[in-house]
Amino acid sequence: MTETLVIRLRASEDAPASWLIVDANGARSGNVQSGPIADALALSQGRRTVLVLPASDVTLARPDLPPVRGAARIAQAVPFALEEHLASDLENLHFAVGHRDASSSAMPVAIVARATLERWQAMWDAAGIRPDAAYAESSLIPSAPNALVLVLDEGTLHVSRPDQS
């Protein structure tokens, strides 16, 4: 699989998805298309499929965790490390834990409401899409040392802090 189908979901259920194909170097192959997510199904055959999720539905965090070994123990520790910073009950949230940077105790985490995740899963299951990866829009904004990076996209301002990677 040298090409990747990138599908961007919108915050509004009524808004169409948009997608494009990129080659192994990240160069666009063709134009951005939009419509119902099912329309992207034919393009997913033989390609890696990546979803870009609305930043408004995904909270990104980097909690400092004590040295804990094993994915299961880390998954148990993360919600409690973030509990006081979240407005929702922990059982209503899904926590996707990234890889710890060897030079830090911070652990990248993406948090999404379980109901929202289930809605997305139903949408891509109904369309026959099998994603290989999913990223929050805001996690795709590049960072720069000692500077904020701001991206204005269709009325939404995305911000990448200097310490965000």
Predicted segments with their positions:
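Hydrophobic/aromatic-enriched cytosolic interaction surfaces used to assemble or bind macromolecules
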Residues: 1-165
